[in-house]
């Protein structure tokens, strides 16, 4: 019961954002304006705050987690790590993101996974069921696709999902309870 009372103080929701009450949000989370968070999405900030930019789409069963990683012999709690997610990103159904830094205009397709050591720059697409867990920065406009997680570079960044965001902003409140915006 105490954890439920602490959540509103640690959660900041930007103007025009739609965050469904059924979404699980724990820890210090800042959600930018015009972002949509579907029901059953999970945003868990254990190791430090998660800062999510504007115009992001976070679909059902997505897990965005800033996990606390404690070594076996470590008695001192590790330093706080801030997770930054840029603007105009799409997290499709069932994707998992642990990356500490994600740029703008990225797409994590259904059931994709981006690990803790990976940095997504801008305009990247992680294909359905593809996993990227290596310690690297994915170059701009990279597409990772297929069963073997092949890579190629696309000519342009993915188009922002502004029409879909507008539609969901109008429709979701008709069918779900919303968390209140902190800034009006």
From Swiss-Prot:
One of its GO terms (cellular component) is dynactin complex. GO terms for biological process: mitotic spindle organization. InterPro entries: DCTN6, Trimer_LpxA-like_sf. Its main location: cytoplasm. Keywords: Cytoplasm, Cytoskeleton. It is found in: Cytoplasm, Cytoskeleton. GO terms for molecular function: dynein complex binding. Subunit of dynactin, a multiprotein complex part of a tripartite complex with dynein and a adapter, such as BICDL1, BICD2 or HOOK3. The dynactin complex is built around ACTR1A/ACTB filament and consists of an actin-related filament composed of a shoulder domain, a pointed end and a barbed end. Part of the dynactin complex that activates the molecular motor dynein for ultra-processive transport along microtubules. Belongs to the dynactin subunits 5/6 family. Dynactin subunit 6 subfamily. This is Dynactin subunit 6. It comes from Nematostella vectensis.
């Amino acid at each position: 019961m105490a954890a439920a009372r602490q959540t509103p103080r640690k959660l900041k929701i930007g103007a025009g954002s739609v965050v469904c009450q059924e979404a699980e949000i724990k820890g210090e989370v800042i959600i930018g304006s015009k972002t949509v968070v579907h029901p059953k999405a999970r945003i868990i900030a254990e190791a430090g705050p998660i800062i999510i930019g504007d115009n992001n789409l976070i679909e059902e069963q997505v897990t965005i987690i800033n996990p606390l990683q404690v070594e076996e012999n470590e008695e001192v709690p590790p330093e706080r790590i801030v997770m930054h997610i840029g603007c105009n990103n799409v997290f499709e159904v069932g994707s998992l993101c642990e990356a500490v830094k994600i740029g703008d205009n990225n797409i994590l397709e259904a059931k994709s996974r981006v690990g803790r050591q990976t940095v997504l720059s801008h305009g990247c697409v992680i294909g359905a069921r593809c996993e990227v867990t290596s310690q690297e920065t994915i170059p701009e406009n990279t597409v990772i696709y297929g069963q073997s997680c092949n890579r190629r570079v696309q000519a342009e960044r993915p188009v922002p999902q502004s029409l879909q965001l507008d539609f969901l902003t109008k429709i979701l409140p008709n069918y779900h309870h919303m968390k209140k915006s902190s800034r009006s």
